[in-house]
């Protein structure tokens, strides 16, 4: 028997259909052996030995069971460092279990799930590439050292910053530097000219102003309407003639096939897909499962290469010649230069597995989004070996006594690669110009002026940030999406309208790291580590020396930072926070200074006269992207007067967000939080009175006869019934009625009901299937102990037989450990 191991079940299913019955194909489902979840787990000595690798037995047991019945084991994990590491781990586990004798373990790789590629790979196996393994282990160890040494001190010195990462933190720094540019941006007014001239045939020609009195015109130089009107009058009264005519052929070269980063960027700009979604779709197209029997449609997608195999290039050129036309094939084979000098060996571009398989021919077997992505990949691949597009560009320079105008236009003469891949990027959009002669006279037909304002820099989108990371040499294709996910999960960024926006936590964390661990968030240092990993892959650098040097610098830095107090940390952050502390003096008490302060909920701006006994100044406002709430700081916004209490109501903002405040009869302040989804403009006097009157009684539950109330707590609006709480995600806490409240409560009760499975035959004690809280999976409860449920059982009611097996297995394992 022969066993072939891949990473995903979908890929295993597709490959199984290509092989003989003597082959069994199983999936590792990613990594199954890693550093322990808790603790460093690595000996800080010259060997960097691991105390104990943590193994996921659920993943590895079926593979080990099949290995015992197999003579040949083909390790067909992904053709990258991580795939090599998984293959190495499997062999190491087999060595520990003494399963390597009389069995051959062969490493094979293929970039596409094509039958011929798989058969060829099986015929040409290789040994495990220890250099790739060393690079993967080094990356994992670097990440562990960075996280486990810097994260704890980050938590101790900032209170809120619970996570730092080798690639994650420099990435966050990129976003924060862009946000600082935006915060410091000062808007500037300028006026724009829209000039249209007429020739003798009355043709309209749109022009741009180039120079005034032989000085280059700066479009930002018209700072107000008076200046614009004055210039408009001068140009309108001028007579123009054609001073110079420039005609030239312009070519647009085709684009290379996709690497992973280029695919993520293009799918975002052209299809509107997020990088995470694009990778998920590409995985489906690569694995081939669930595609109506089509098999794998594209090659390996987590690649940093844009090159194609020579044999595939020849097929592609023949296809262009036969199906599009001989005159569309490029004169000679186009060889694209790799963007990175450290592209992993064996990697190829993301291309269709079968070039002749046109998107429209298989459209009915794909989902709409699968089709769109395949169509994009197919067109880009076909276009990569086609001729350039050509156009004739014409420039007219039009001169008066004082001004020079320029009119430009172009005419397409040959569509070339754009016949297939014709996505407009705006670069070729231009007017069609009439034929003008030298010294021909033209008159101003229309001249409009328009007020404009300079705009701050755009925030990064996920695709834009990937491009920036690639330019800086930070991260690799397999890590990009994971970086964004982790930053968002840790509340360091928010993603709104496709823009990545640092939160207050993210901004101050970067200031702390940049102030005290500056080398470790330096782009050059991070990129150099990536290069070192690539050099380890090529056997040009010893992996242990990389770890030793990194640890030496890291340990020295940690020792220095440990000596800094929180006060010293805050002082240094204040020095580098001009964009946050634009106001120096407290607007409430007038004699205090504004400073950044730390809390478990995150950083905030407060007054130096603040004291915990509430006798000092209470001014504060949260940090974050919600700059529109800064005006609510201090005294806040006056909403109106409550006719019943005759007290003023103010809308304010503090470190925990927005709230309403009024005074009670005894002079004490009464406050209530504002639901996050409620906009400031919705909060009028009536809404304010209703919010301040919370909690409110809604009525009795018809079955329990117990009171239902509505209120707002630290986690938002909620219903309370029978000492249990139900979150209000969509409903208005001030308006929800009894019928809707009962509906939500009953739904919540039903979703959390325990299921009695039965009694244990030995002890006669009950076995109950319980619902996990806060999105956690279900579990079994028996004899006052909890038992995890296997992944494939989480969505169904468990039988008594299955429950007994889970419980007895866990109890027996514990007994074995005691021995």
Predicted regions and their residues:
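C-terminal or mid-to-C-terminal helical accessory/interaction module adjacent to the motor/catalytic core
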Residues: 113-195, 248
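Short acidic, hydrophobic short linear motifs in intrinsically disordered regions
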Residues: 242-246, 253-267, 292-303, 456-468, ...
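Glycine-centered, phosphate/nucleic-acid-interacting loop/turn motifs that mediate DNA/RNA or nucleotide
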Residues: 289, 296, 491
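Basic, low-complexity terminal or inter-domain segments flanking catalytic cores
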Residues: 2, 14, 151, 184, ...
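Conserved nucleotide-binding/hydrolysis micro-motifs of P-loop NTPases
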Residues: 9-12, 29-34, 79-83, 111-116, ...
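Metal- or metallocofactor-binding catalytic centers and their adjacent structured scaffolds
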Residues: 216-256, 440
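Intrinsically disordered, low-complexity regulatory segments
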Residues: 1-140, 144-149, 210, 222-223, ...
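Conserved short loop/turn motifs at secondary-structure junctions
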Residues: 1, 78-80, 159-161, 247-256, ...
């Amino acid at each position: 028997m022969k066993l072939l191991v891949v990473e995903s079940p979908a890929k295993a299913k597709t490959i199984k259909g290509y092989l003989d019955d003597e082959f069994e194909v199983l999936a590792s489902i990613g990594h199954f052996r890693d550093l322990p979840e808790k603790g460093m787990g690595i000996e800080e000595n010259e060997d960097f030995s691991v105390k104990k690798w943590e193994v996921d037995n659920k993943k590895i047991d079926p593979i080990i069971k099949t290995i015992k019945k197999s003579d040949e084991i083909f390790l067909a994990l992904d053709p990258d460092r991580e795939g090599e590491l998984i293959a190495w781990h499997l062999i190491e586990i087999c060595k520990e279990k003494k399963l390597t004798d009389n069995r051959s373990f062969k490493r094979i790789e293929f970039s596409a799930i094509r039958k011929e590629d798989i058969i060829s790979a099986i015929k040409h196996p290789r040994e495990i590439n220890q250099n790739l393994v060393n690079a993967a282990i080094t990356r994992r160890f670097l990440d562990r050292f960075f996280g486990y040494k810097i994260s704890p001190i980050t938590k101790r010195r900032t209170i809120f910053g619970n996570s730092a990462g080798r690639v994650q933190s420099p990435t966050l720094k990129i976003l924060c530097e862009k946000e600082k540019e935006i915060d410091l941006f000062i808007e500037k007014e300028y006026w724009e000219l829209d000039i249209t001239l007429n020739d003798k045939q009355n043709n309209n020609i749109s022009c741009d102003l180039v120079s005034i009195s032989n000085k280059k015109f700066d479009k930002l130089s018209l700072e107000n309407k008076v200046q614009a009107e004055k210039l408009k009058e001068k140009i309108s009264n001028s007579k123009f003639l054609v001073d110079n005519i420039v005609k030239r052929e312009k070519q647009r070269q085709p684009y290379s096939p996709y690497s992973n980063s280029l695919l993520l960027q293009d799918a975002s700009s052209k299809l509107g897909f997020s990088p995470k979604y694009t990778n998920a779709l590409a995985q489906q197209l690569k694995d081939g499962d669930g595609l109506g029997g089509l098999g794998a449609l594209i090659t390996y997608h987590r690649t940093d290469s844009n090159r194609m195999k020579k044999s595939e290039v020849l097929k592609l050129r023949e296809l262009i010649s036969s199906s599009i036309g001989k005159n569309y094939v490029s004169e000679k084979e186009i060889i694209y230069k790799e963007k990175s000098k450290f592209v992993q060996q064996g990697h190829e571009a993301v291309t269709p597995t079968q070039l002749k398989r046109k998107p429209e021919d298989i459209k009915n077997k794909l989902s709409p989004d699968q089709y769109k992505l395949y169509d994009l990949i197919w067109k880009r691949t076909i276009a990569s070996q086609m001729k350039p597009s050509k156009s004739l560009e014409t420039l007219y320079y039009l001169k008066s006594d004082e001004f020079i105008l320029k009119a430009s236009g172009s005419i397409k003469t040959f569509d070339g690669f754009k016949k297939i891949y014709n996505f407009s990027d705006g670069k070729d959009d231009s007017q069609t110009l009439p034929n003008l002669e030298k010294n021909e006279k033209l008159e101003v037909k229309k001249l409009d002026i328009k007020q404009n304002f300079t705009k701050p820099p755009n925030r990064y989108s996920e695709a834009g940030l990937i491009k920036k990371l690639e330019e800086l040499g930070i991260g690799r294709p397999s890590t990009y999406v994971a970086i964004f996910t982790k930053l968002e999960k840790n509340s360091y960024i928010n993603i709104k309208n496709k823009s990545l926006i640092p939160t207050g936590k993210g901004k101050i964390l970067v200031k702390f790291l940049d102030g005290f661990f500056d080398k470790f968030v330096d782009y050059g240092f991070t990129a150099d580590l990536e290069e070192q990993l690539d050099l380890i892959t090529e056997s040009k650098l010893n992996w242990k020396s990389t770890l030793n040097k990194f640890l030496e610098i890291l340990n020295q830095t940690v020792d220095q930072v440990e000596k800094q107090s929180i006060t010293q940390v805050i002082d240094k952050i204040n020095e580098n926070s001009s964009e946050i502390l634009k106001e120096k003096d407290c607007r409430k008490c007038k004699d205090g200074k504004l400073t950044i302060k730390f809390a478990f909920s995150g950083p905030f701006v407060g007054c130096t006269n603040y004291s915990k006994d509430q006798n000092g100044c209470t001014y504060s406002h949260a940090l974050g992207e919600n700059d529109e709430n800064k005006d609510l700081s201090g005294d806040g916004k006056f909403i109106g007067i409550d006719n019943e209490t005759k007290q003023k109501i103010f809308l304010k903002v503090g470190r925990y967000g927005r709230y309403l405040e009024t005074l009670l009869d005894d002079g004490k302040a009464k406050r209530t939080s504002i639901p996050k989804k409620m906009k400031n403009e919705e909060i009028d006097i009536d809404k304010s009175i209703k919010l301040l009157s919370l909690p409110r009684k809604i009525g009795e539950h018809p079955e329990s006869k117990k009171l239902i109330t509505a209120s707002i707590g630290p986690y938002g609006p909620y219903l309370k019934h029978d000492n249990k709480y139900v979150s209000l995600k969509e409903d208005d806490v001030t308006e929800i009625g009894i019928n809707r409240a009962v509906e939500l409560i009953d739904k919540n009760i039903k979703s959390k009901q325990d299921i009695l499975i039965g009694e244990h035959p030995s002890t006669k004690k009950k076995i109950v299937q319980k619902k996990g809280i806060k999105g956690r999976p279900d579990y079994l409860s028996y004899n006052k102990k909890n038992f995890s449920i296997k992944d494939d059982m989480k969505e169904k009611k468990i039988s008594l037989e299955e429950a007994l097996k889970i419980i007895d297995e866990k109890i027996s394992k514990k007994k074995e450990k005691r021995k």
